[in-house]
């Protein structure tokens, strides 16, 4: 109510007019009038003329009178959300929610929608580093400002990403760095492996959207669909094997004769060990990182009333969960990818346009926008034992050579405690 350009932020009226006009040109009303042979002047006149219409509201459809152009702006006020859930072992899609009301919002955000994915892309980078460099979740890297030099890895200018809140200065294990989405550590990993292997891995995991060969993909700058992301994350849960999502397993006639049956399309992508170590990293997100709200009330509960902000909080899950939050620039998109051994579920929340976003990171982060949907969905799924959703831990490989227990003084990458620092320096860190 206090924003005169609502629901947009950081836009001038002229920019808003352009945005609304572009949306109008993509509308069904515009398409039908063009097919009918109407010229632009006539079409624009119709968009500015008040007419009776039925519009969506959270209290049910309501009849009103407004111009079609005003109705476009009205609908921009609503946050959109989508969710997809699949069994990573079979590829069978268990749930698909492309939006909250198909009658008024005829767009499938799961398959058609492509949005910046933020830090949910980081596991592809970490998995590449683990697979190529044999890094352990316990390896320690400096959390300090780091730049990839100009003309390196496809970059024209120097790339010097900053951490959220501009906080630096400590050494972090890989597990802690991913759990807390530390950008400087991601930059160091990207400098070591380069964008090409990360892109190659993402492609094998079912990512078909455009991925620029530049270091900044480490922070999730590409636009990718939720459909692609859920399929890709399933590779981690399925011991490194990608299974293409399946919506229809078979078709039978009225007599039960099978007319069509899908043969799952699978690709060996990662070693079982690399996939498991990546899953172990992602478990850290819900144990001590940005997804800890799934477990218990936050440490800063006394200073910030999450119950007034996050629906259904606290959730108090006790079982092993691997996951990753994602938040994009200006809090325009909130993501949460969550995994248990036999179910991978992804959630995206955001405005129809990136100019519709939260001002405050507390409201606009993936842990606030998307994680609650995942939590309430999973809580409901666990209340139905017949679904068989796993409460167990992810199965470890028979031979695990990469240390994952960071509480033990186990040699890391075959090195003892004394020469561990020298080894990391030898790798270029």
Name what the model sees in each region.
Residues 75-81, 104-124, 138-140, 171-172, ...:
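Short active-site loop at a secondary-structure junction
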Residues 135-198, 242, 252-283:
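Conserved catalytic neighborhood of penicillin-recognizing serine enzymes
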Residues 1-87, 92, 96, 102-107, ...:
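A penicillin-recognizing enzyme superfamily signal
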Residues 88, 103, 130-139, 208-210, ...:
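Secondary-structure transition/capping motifs at alpha-helix termini
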Residues 130, 191, 203, 237:
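Short polybasic/polar patches that bind polyanions
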Residues 155-160, 192-231:
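Mid-domain, small-residue-enriched loop/turn segments at the edges of structured enzyme/sensor domains
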Residues 127:
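Extracellular glycan-interaction surfaces
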């Amino acid at each position: 109510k206090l924003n005169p350009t609502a629901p947009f932020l950081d836009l001038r009226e002229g920019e808003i007019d352009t945005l609304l006009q572009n949306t109008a040109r993509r509308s069904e009303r515009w398409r039908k009038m063009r097919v009918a042979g109407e010229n632009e002047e006539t079409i624009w006149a119709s968009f500015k003329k008040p007419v009776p219409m039925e519009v969506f509201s959270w209290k049910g459809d309501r009849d009103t009178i407004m111009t079609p152009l005003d109705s476009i702006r009205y609908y921009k006020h609503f946050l959109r959300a989508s969710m997809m859930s699949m069994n990573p072992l079979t590829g069978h899609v268990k749930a698909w929610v492309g939006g909250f009301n198909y009658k008024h919002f005829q767009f499938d955000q799961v398959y058609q929608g492509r949005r910046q994915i933020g830090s949910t892309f980081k596991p592809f980078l970490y998995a590449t580093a683990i697979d190529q460099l044999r890094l352990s979740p316990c390896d320690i890297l400096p959390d300090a400002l780091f730049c990839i030099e100009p003309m390196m890895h496809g970059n024209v200018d120097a790339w010097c990403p900053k951490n959220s809140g501009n906080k630096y200065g400590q050494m972090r294990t890989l597990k802690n760095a991913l759990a807390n989405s530390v950008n400087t550590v991601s930059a160091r990993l990207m400098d070591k492996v380069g964008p090409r292997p990360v892109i190659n891995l993402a492609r094998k995991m079912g990512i078909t959207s455009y991925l620029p060969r530049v270091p900044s993909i480490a922070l999730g700058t590409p636009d990718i669909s939720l459909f692609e992301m859920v399929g890709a994350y399933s590779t981690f849960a399925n011991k490194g094997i990608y299974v293409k999502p399946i919506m229809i397993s078979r078709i039978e006639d009225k007599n039960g004769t099978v007319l069509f049956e899908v043969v799952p399309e699978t690709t060996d992508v990662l070693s079982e060990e690399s996939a498991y170590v990546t899953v172990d990293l992602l478990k850290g997100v819900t144990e001590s990182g940005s997804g800890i709200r799934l477990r218990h009330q936050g440490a800063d509960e006394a200073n910030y009333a999450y119950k007034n902000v996050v629906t259904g909080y606290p959730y108090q899950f006790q079982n092993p969960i691997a996951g990753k939050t994602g938040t994009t620039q200006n809090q325009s998109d909130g993501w949460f990818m969550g995994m248990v051994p036999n179910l991978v579920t992804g959630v995206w929340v955001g405005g129809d346009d990136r100019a519709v976003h939260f001002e405050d990171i507390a409201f606009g982060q993936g842990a606030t926008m998307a994680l609650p949907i995942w939590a309430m969905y999973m809580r409901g799924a666990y209340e139905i034992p017949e679904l068989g959703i796993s409460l167990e831990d992810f199965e470890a490989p028979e031979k695990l050579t990469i240390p994952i227990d960071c509480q033990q003084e186990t040699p890391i990458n075959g090195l003892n405690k004394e020469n561990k620092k020298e080894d990391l320096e030898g790798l270029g860190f």
